[in-house]
C-alpha cells in the first residue's frame, strides 16, 4: 500500500488537457492506495463557491466518486484559499489546516502547500498575512461576483509580472523556515508544493524535504510507501 500526494494542478477551463489528465489520474492511479492528499492550488483561481464554473462541479463529482474508495484530504493553496468546507464536503474531501502533521508509515511528517516557507518574498508574505485575516475574507466574500472576478484577474496578472522580476532564491523556500517548522512540529519529514520544483532533499540529521511537482507540462504525483519514496511523472495523453 502507498499514500499519494499531488498539488499545483491549477485546473481551469483554459487547460482542458490538465483537467482530463486529472480525471484519468483519479480513475487509474488510486489502486493499492491508503489515502490521497491534495496540497493546494487544485484550481488556477477560486473566488467563491457561487462562481464555480460547471467544470468545477464535474471535478467535484469525480473526486467524490474517488473518495468512496479511499480518504481524500485537501490543504488550501494560494490560488484556491477560498474553497469552502461545503465544497470540500460535496467533493468528498476532508479539509485540513494549512499545516498538518501525519504519521506516514512510522515517519512523523508535516505537510503544507508551501507558500508560507518562502519568507524572503516579503511583499507576498505581507499580502498572505492580510489575505488570511478573518475580516478580509468576510469582506471579499461579500463583494459582488463581478468585483471578485475583477480582483482575481488583477492579482493574478500582478503576481505573474512580479514573479518575472524576482530572483530564483526569493521565490524558493527559505531553509531556516523549513528547519523552524520541522522543529516546531517535531517531525522528521516535510512534504509541500507551491514552488513547482519537484525534488527529494536530504537534510541534516536524517531529515527529508519533498517537493511535489506541478501539472503544467505533465502530471506529477508523489508516492510514499513503507519502503519507497518516488516522484512519478504522468505524461498527458497516457
Curated annotation (Swiss-Prot):
<keyword id="KW-1003">Cell membrane</keyword>
<feature type="binding site">
    <location>
        <position position="163"/>
    </location>
    <ligand>
        <name>substrate</name>
    </ligand>
</feature>
<feature type="binding site">
    <location>
        <position position="166"/>
    </location>
    <ligand>
        <name>substrate</name>
    </ligand>
</feature>
<dbReference type="InterPro" id="IPR010138">
    <property type="entry name" value="UDP-diacylglucosamine_Hdrlase"/>
</dbReference>
<keyword id="KW-0997">Cell inner membrane</keyword>
<feature type="binding site">
    <location>
        <position position="121"/>
    </location>
    <ligand>
        <name>substrate</name>
    </ligand>
</feature>
<dbReference type="InterPro" id="IPR043461">
    <property type="entry name" value="LpxH-like"/>
</dbReference>
<dbReference type="GO" id="GO:0009245">
    <property type="term" value="P:lipid A biosynthetic process"/>
</dbReference>
<feature type="binding site">
    <location>
        <position position="78"/>
    </location>
    <ligand>
        <name>Mn(2+) 2</name>
    </ligand>
</feature>
<feature type="binding site">
    <location>
        <position position="10"/>
    </location>
    <ligand>
        <name>Mn(2+) 1</name>
    </ligand>
</feature>
<feature type="binding site">
    <location>
        <position position="194"/>
    </location>
    <ligand>
        <name>substrate</name>
    </ligand>
</feature>
<feature type="binding site">
    <location>
        <position position="41"/>
    </location>
    <ligand>
        <name>Mn(2+) 1</name>
    </ligand>
</feature>
<keyword id="KW-0441">Lipid A biosynthesis</keyword>
<feature type="binding site">
    <location>
        <position position="159"/>
    </location>
    <ligand>
        <name>substrate</name>
    </ligand>
</feature>
<feature type="binding site">
    <location>
        <position position="8"/>
    </location>
    <ligand>
        <name>Mn(2+) 1</name>
    </ligand>
</feature>
<keyword id="KW-0464">Manganese</keyword>
<protein>
    <recommendedName>
        <fullName>UDP-2,3-diacylglucosamine hydrolase</fullName>
        <ecNumber>3.6.1.54</ecNumber>
    </recommendedName>
</protein>
<keyword id="KW-0472">Membrane</keyword>
<dbReference type="InterPro" id="IPR004843">
    <property type="entry name" value="Calcineurin-like_PHP_ApaH"/>
</dbReference>
<keyword id="KW-0378">Hydrolase</keyword>
<dbReference type="InterPro" id="IPR029052">
    <property type="entry name" value="Metallo-depent_PP-like"/>
</dbReference>
<feature type="binding site">
    <location>
        <position position="196"/>
    </location>
    <ligand>
        <name>Mn(2+) 1</name>
    </ligand>
</feature>
<keyword id="KW-0443">Lipid metabolism</keyword>
<comment type="function">
    <text>Hydrolyzes the pyrophosphate bond of UDP-2,3-diacylglucosamine to yield 2,3-diacylglucosamine 1-phosphate (lipid X) and UMP by catalyzing the attack of water at the alpha-P atom. Involved in the biosynthesis of lipid A, a phosphorylated glycolipid that anchors the lipopolysaccharide to the outer membrane of the cell.</text>
</comment>
<keyword id="KW-0479">Metal-binding</keyword>
<feature type="binding site">
    <location>
        <position position="194"/>
    </location>
    <ligand>
        <name>Mn(2+) 2</name>
    </ligand>
</feature>
<dbReference type="GO" id="GO:0005737">
    <property type="term" value="C:cytoplasm"/>
</dbReference>
<comment type="pathway">
    <text>Glycolipid biosynthesis; lipid IV(A) biosynthesis; lipid IV(A) from (3R)-3-hydroxytetradecanoyl-[acyl-carrier-protein] and UDP-N-acetyl-alpha-D-glucosamine: step 4/6.</text>
</comment>
<comment type="similarity">
    <text>Belongs to the LpxH family.</text>
</comment>
<feature type="binding site">
    <location>
        <begin position="78"/>
        <end position="79"/>
    </location>
    <ligand>
        <name>substrate</name>
    </ligand>
</feature>
<keyword id="KW-0444">Lipid biosynthesis</keyword>
<dbReference type="GO" id="GO:0008758">
    <property type="term" value="F:UDP-2,3-diacylglucosamine hydrolase activity"/>
</dbReference>
<feature type="binding site">
    <location>
        <position position="41"/>
    </location>
    <ligand>
        <name>Mn(2+) 2</name>
    </ligand>
</feature>
<feature type="binding site">
    <location>
        <position position="113"/>
    </location>
    <ligand>
        <name>Mn(2+) 2</name>
    </ligand>
</feature>
<dbReference type="GO" id="GO:0019897">
    <property type="term" value="C:extrinsic component of plasma membrane"/>
</dbReference>
<dbReference type="GO" id="GO:0030145">
    <property type="term" value="F:manganese ion binding"/>
</dbReference>
<dbReference type="Pfam" id="PF00149">
    <property type="entry name" value="Metallophos"/>
</dbReference>
Amino acid at each position: 500500500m502507498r499514500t499519494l500526494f499531488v498539488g499545483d494542478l491549477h485546473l481551469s477551463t483554459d487547460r482542458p488537457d490538465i483537467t482530463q489528465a486529472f480525471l484519468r489520474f483519479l480513475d487509474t492511479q488510486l489502486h493499492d492506495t491508503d489515502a490521497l492528499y491534495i496540497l493546494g492550488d487544485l484550481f488556477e483561481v477560486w473566488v467563491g463557491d457561487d462562481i464555480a464554473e460547471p467544470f468545477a462541479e464535474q471535478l467535484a463529482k469525480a473526486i467524490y466518486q474517488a473518495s468512496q474508495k479511499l480518504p481524500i484530504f485537501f490543504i488550501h493553496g494560494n490560488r484556491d484559499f477560498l474553497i469552502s468546507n461545503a465544497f470540500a464536503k460535496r467533493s468528498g474531501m476532508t479539509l485540513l489546516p494549512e499545516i498538518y502533521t501525519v504519521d506516514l508509515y512510522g515517519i512523523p511528517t508535516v505537510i503544507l502547500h508551501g507558500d508560507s516557507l518562502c519568507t524572503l518574498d516579503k511583499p507576498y508574505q505581507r499580502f498572505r498575512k492580510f489575505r488570511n485575516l478573518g475580516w478580509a475574507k468576510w469582506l471579499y466574500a461579500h463583494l459582488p461576483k463581478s468585483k471578485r472576478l475583477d480582483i482575481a484577474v488583477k492579482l493574478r496578472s500582478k503576481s505573474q509580472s512580479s514573479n518575472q522580476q524576482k530572483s530564483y532564491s526569493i521565490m524558493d523556500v527559505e531553509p531556516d523556515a523549513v528547519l523552524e517548522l520541522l522543529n516546531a512540529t517535531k517531525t522528521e519529514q516535510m512534504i509541500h508544493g507551491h514552488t513547482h520544483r519537484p525534488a527529494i532533499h536530504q537534510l541534516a540529521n536524517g531529515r527529508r524535504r519533498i517537493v511535489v511537482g506541478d501539472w503544467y507540462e505533465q502530471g506529477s504525483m508523489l508516492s510514499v510507501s513503507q519502503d519507497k519514496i518516488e516522484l512519478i511523472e504522468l505524461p498527458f495523453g497516457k
